[in-house]
Design a protein with these regions (language model features):
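Contiguous, structured surface segment used for ligand recognition
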Residues: 1-154
């Protein structure tokens, strides 16, 4: 089973947002949700991930991207990773509010079919860590963890 190390030994994976094919307001929305997910990771681990826009390729990274309606309209980073990994994204391309959650040893790829699908994919990380959607409104405190892994099964 493939496991992606989101947090271990006081170190979290960085979050990389591919915004090359996004309108500015959509990019702001994706970044805002990425910040909320970072806060959820911090609630569980005590360490807040860094958000960036380019791959490091030497450390674990969560890559977030909105796919275009066609492969010609994908973001540059998404297109590169899809080609590099020979991924089939046809299951979500052109659909509404869908996402792919792809786990590799060094990357967790979250590809959304649109902005909302990408947001759902990012919040899936919080859900898998055991963070309640009520954490902000009802002071529901998530359980602290020494290690956080994402697996290919979710």
């Amino acid at each position: 089973m493939i496991k992606f190390e989101l947090y271990k030994n006081r170190k979290t994976a960085n979050i990389v947002i591919d915004k090359t094919n996004l309108k500015e307001k959509d990019a702001r929305g994706i970044r805002r949700v990425a910040q909320k997910v970072c806060k959820d990771v911090e609630r569980v681990t005590g360490v807040c991930p860094v958000i960036g826009e380019s791959l490091c390729r030497t450390e674990n990274e969560v890559v977030v991207a909105v796919l275009g309606k066609t492969s010609d309209t994908d973001g540059a980073l998404a297109a590169e990773l899809i080609a590099e990994m020979q991924m089939d994204v046809s299951s979500i391309r052109g659909k509404r509010e869908s996402f792919l959650f792809v786990v590799t040893e060094q990357r967790l790829l979250i590809f959304g079919s649109d902005k909302r699908g990408t947001i759902y994919g990012m919040f899936h990380i919080s859900e898998l860590m055991g963070v309640s959607p009520w954490v902000t409104f009802a002071d529901v405190v998530p359980e602290r963890k020494d290690e956080v892994y994402m697996t290919e099964i979710g």
